[in-house]
Amino acid sequence: MNVHMYENTATQKNLDICKSYHIKIVEPEIGELACGYQGRGHLSDIEDLLDAIEYATSPHPLAGKHVLITAGPTQEALDPVRYITNHSSGKMGYALAKVARQLGAHVTLISGPSSQRAPYEVDVIKIQSAQGMFKQVLSYFDFQDYVIMSAAVGDYRPLEYSNQKIKKKA
């Protein structure tokens, strides 16, 4: 779809009418369009489309529930270049978030660095360190019906952070 077609008043009014009937709209993404323009109108990611279809055709036993999930590794900085971490990919936490969303829950995913694709309609909060994860979990914890702690949080952090790259000692 062309960005100008999508932004047209008639198109927007028709989308609003559909939404007023609780019809789920998978919005187009922002990107390069076939006409050469940049803007909203690019076909949504196929995974998002499939997730929306699966959600629309699934039962929702967790509807109205809030689920907090942690995922991925944490990184503890030693200096501006190096950090301590582990090999966690975050796959399990992201998969749990996707399933909880498909079951109708409002899902908040607090994730360390991960290359996993954010699940459709899941609120993702990116963090780096164990302290960052701790603070985010505490800020959301009291509002959750379920909490799943699947992150691979680091066991250690340095006593001191060096503002400059630590030199090798021969």
Regions found by a protein language model. Give the residues of each.
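Short glycine-rich anion-binding loops that position phosphate/pyrophosphate groups of nucleotides
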Residues: 31, 72-76, 151-158
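A glycine- and small/hydrophobic-rich beta-loop-beta segment
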Residues: 113, 121-170
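Flexible nucleotide-interacting loop at or near the entrance of a catalytic core
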Residues: 50-63
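Glycine-rich phosphate/diphosphate-binding loop of Rossmann-like nucleotide-binding domains
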Residues: 12, 16, 61-129
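A short acidic, helix-capping loop that chelates divalent metal ions and anchors anionic groups
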Residues: 4-6, 33-37, 78-79, 118
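Glycine/threonine-rich flexible loop motifs
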Residues: 4-8, 78-85, 156-170
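Short, glycine-/small-residue-rich phosphate/pyrophosphate-handling segment
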Residues: 1-30, 40-53
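General beta-strand structural signal in soluble alpha/beta enzymes
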Residues: 25-28, 109-111, 149-150
